[in-house]
Regions:
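Non-catalytic terminal and connector segments of soluble metabolic enzymes
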Residues: 1-159
Length: 159
């Protein structure tokens, strides 16, 4: 099934100059970027994006982390893109992420460390958790006119 999913390269990924390396991984497996922009979100937008977490103990650290610098927001399209991106990104805690995933390869944080510092875990990437969430997040982050339809070589060989 062809799906669209939201991916955010968080401020730690941007500040560490990992944008190209992360995007290349998604393109290498045939995912198509149909929307992309750099934005610096404020606390109000953070509350909209992380609405499920606003009342949780860790939210203030999460809000500080996501608003500390620019974010690359992308909509990726492809076959089973929600599931594929989640597999590629890896476990939320980089310490437990499987080797070969983005978080295992590029992030170092653990819950133990970040909890001791009172900060949110820096895990480089946000990826929609399921198809329903992906639809909601894409609509929150992108206007319809910011999403594009075009063909790639993968359309010929995969779809």
């Amino acid at each position: 099934m062809i799906e669209r999913t939201l991916v955010l390269l968080k401020p730690d990924a941007v500040q560490r100059a990992l944008i190209g390396k992360v995007i290349q991984r998604f393109e290498n497996v045939g995912l198509k970027i149909v929307g992309m922009k750099m934005v610096w979100i404020d606390k109000n937008f953070s509350k909209k994006h992380y609405s499920a977490h606003v009342e949780k103990k860790f939210y203030s650290g999460l809000e500080n982390m996501i608003t500390e610098g620019p974010v690359i927001a992308m909509v990726l399209e492809g076959l089973h893109s929600v599931e594929l991106v989640r597999k590629m990104v890896g476990s939320t805690e980089p310490r437990t992420a499987q080797p070969g995933t983005i978080r295992a390869d590029f992030a170092q944080h653990s819950y133990e460390y970040t909890d001791s510092k009172g900060k949110a875990i820096k895990n480089l990437v946000h990826a929609s958790g399921n198809i329903k969430e992906a639809k909601q997040e894409v609509e929150l982050w992108f206007k319809p006119e910011e999403l594009h339809i075009y063909k790639t070589v993968h359309d010929i060989h995969v779809l």
